[in-house]
């Protein structure tokens, strides 16, 4: 899927990791692409016949793959995790789940910057969603420097991924009427001390999410100091509208021009000229590439759970392998 294929590519780019195989439930074009990229395919037992009829060779079942790996990165759709967690537990292997699952599935949620150590040596962990990852990348450094009294965030969410022809709306704005949205509690699974409220709207776009953030700070900040706090955070890219980046469209054009794999923008993009501090209140906009921002977090989570190295070293290695400018 969207995240799984990217994680497989990112892991294969690391010097200290090996992708043993990837799983698919049906012999789609993505299965062929996975084989083209050199990945061995595995599938649930019930899908073996489908692959045989399509003449797509597989290396075995999901259970077979579990017997060959140290850790599984589970990128199945939300709410499927409990079923596969039982499979991984029976096999005695570690597993990482994604933000579509509840925090309660693992009891640990992961972010490279904010709580890398919490997953150290764990059998199961969960990388939070794309939007939550985006919020943590900027909220954490601001909280460390100024303290956050309260956070108010409105998320303008893409309606569907670019490769999704089934979701919508395609001509409208759809509010999430159940409030607050899940994003605030998800942030609190990693930063439980932050008082945060979130609202969300789905918009007729496919390429990125947009956040408008208003923070009440414990200590006053200047605009310049706030910009520096955000700029110095790893996996945040500052842009300026005067350079021509006025929307998410230009951000994705920038990513294509950087020749990233699949044109991915792993960093959270913040408009420097859209950051404004007024006493204890801070305002800013940020854009989130929902297809890719969690990918480097999954790589770092592997190292934490396998007790490979500390957070700074892992982030540096991951960033170098993926072409992300590194900041301490």
Features from the language model and the residues they span:
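NAD(P)-dependent Rossmann-like dehydrogenase/reductase catalytic/cofactor-binding core
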Residues: 263-328
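C-terminal substrate-binding/catalytic lobe of Rossmann-fold NAD(P)-dependent oxidoreductases
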Residues: 2-62, 66, 147-150, 154-286
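Hydrophobic/aromatic-lined pockets within catalytic cores
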Residues: 12, 143, 231, 303-306, ...
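Predominant activation on well-ordered alpha-helical scaffold segments within soluble catalytic domains
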Residues: 8, 136-143, 184-188, 224-227, ...
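Intrinsic-disorder/low-complexity, polar/charged segments
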Residues: 81-83, 247, 291
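N-terminal Rossmann-like NAD(P) cofactor-binding subdomain of oxidoreductases
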Residues: 1-164, 312-318, 323-326
